[in-house]
Structure formats: structure tokens, C-alpha cells
Amino acid sequence: MFRLLATNKTAIGLDPRPSPATHVVDDLSDRVWLRDLITREKITHIIHAGGVSGPMVMADDPVGVIAINVTGSMNLLNEAMAGGVTTFVYCSSVAAIGNFYEQEPIGEDYPMWPTSTYGCSKAAVDYVLRGLWKKMPLDICSLRLTAVYGPGRTTEFTVDTIVRAALAGKPARLDPLTDWPYIYVDDAADAAIAACFSQNRKQLAYFVAHPERVTPEDIAAACRAAGYPVRLEIDTSKPIAARGPVDVEAAARDFGFRAKIGHREGIRRMIEAATR
């Protein structure tokens, strides 16, 4: 939100939880209320980044995940169409793809085989957007974010697990995974803003990632370089979570986005923020 305001755009933050960036507290369940908000505030562009934020959240409540991520998204999309919004950017996830590992970067047309309810919820909305793309006046775009990390994240994923263990002087316990692509939170925000106001997008979906492919050992090395060594304990009895390279050139070509913050700098910033 703060990066959007820095572009001199008038912005309204909507979230179910109050925060300094939240102007409206809402959960996207009331379509009539959403339509009134869009009309009253003369909303022209929507960046929809809300909802259940990862497979680790509400993993035991699939009905709740679908209600928030699918029904809530459909409510917002429907009222955007009815309210004359011009652009709708949906923050999807590489989790919509599921496990994959190709030697060459995959593109937007790679098959979606999600492996979690969260991933299924993201794929479901992506399919709806595919069905609507170029068939209505609303300009729609789906950004398939890879693993987002950085200061301020309240849920825990691989980077968070390793960094928090390093800060606590404890081992980091992980399930096995490949060398994943990641995206720092500030880069993810910049990508959403760039896509939202671009006039040159040529496709519906784009992957948003730093081109680095990062292993848990790389993350641990970055913690060590920042002064916080950590030992990894990998549970090899679990299946490997595979993610390979994704196409980042389409985003660069169509809306000028290239991730700037690699994992070493991103982890340094996380540790700095946590130790202030």
C-alpha cells in the first residue's frame, strides 16, 4: 500500500484485519456492500492480494479456504465488472501449478496440477479469469507469485523457518525441497503495481520471481553471512516439494518488471528488521 501511495495514486486498502495500511475492514463476503464501495469511491483499478496466503494457513479447513479465496475473489470480481472498474489484477500463486521441475523455465500455459487446497483455490480463480479474458471490458491479469518472503510476514514458510531458527540459535526443521524461485515482498509489490498500470500486457498470466534458484542451504548460508549461522534438519521421510525455474521474461517484456532483490540481500533485510 505504501509503495502504491508513493506513486501519487489515490489508494484504498481493504483487509479483514485492521492495520496502518487498511482503510476499510471487510472480508469480501457482501457483494452489495462491495458494489457500494466501488461506486462511492469511484474505484478504477483493483489489485487483489488478499485471502488465505499459503498452504500452511487453514490447512485443516478446506471449506474456509475455498470460501475466502474463491467465493471472496468471485464477489470482488463480479462487483468490479458491475461497477465499471477498468483493471483487475489478481495475485495468484505458483502453488496453482503444483509440483514441477523442468530444465527450462515454464510459461503461463504450463498445466496446473495443484497439490493443496490453497493451490486449488488459486487455480480455480485462474481458470475463471481464463474463461473471461478478452470477453469483457474489464482488463484482467493474474500474477503467479513464487514464494514471497520478507519482513512483516506473519505465517511461516521455508525462508521464515530458517531465518527464525537462525535468530533463535536453534536448528531449522524442514521438509525436503528443490532449488526454488523466490520473490522478496517489495519486488512482489512493485510487480503488482507495474502490471496494474501497464498498457502493454499481451497475456493473462505472468510468473513473478527472482531468476535465482535457491536451496535451503543457500538460505542458511545467507543467514551465516549476516552473522546468524543455522543448522538444517531435513525430514527425508517426507516427499520432495519440487519447483523449478519459471519464465520471468514475459513480465519484463510486457510491464518492465525485473526483481531487484536477491536472496542474500533479502535475508539480510529480514534479519536487520528482526534485530532492530
Predicted regions and their residues:
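Substrate-binding strand-loop-helix patch
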Residues: P151-E156, L177-A189, A205-C223, I261, ...
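C-terminal "lid/loop" region of Rossmann-like NAD(P)-dependent oxidoreductases
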Residues: Q203-Y206, V214-A221, Y228-R243, V248
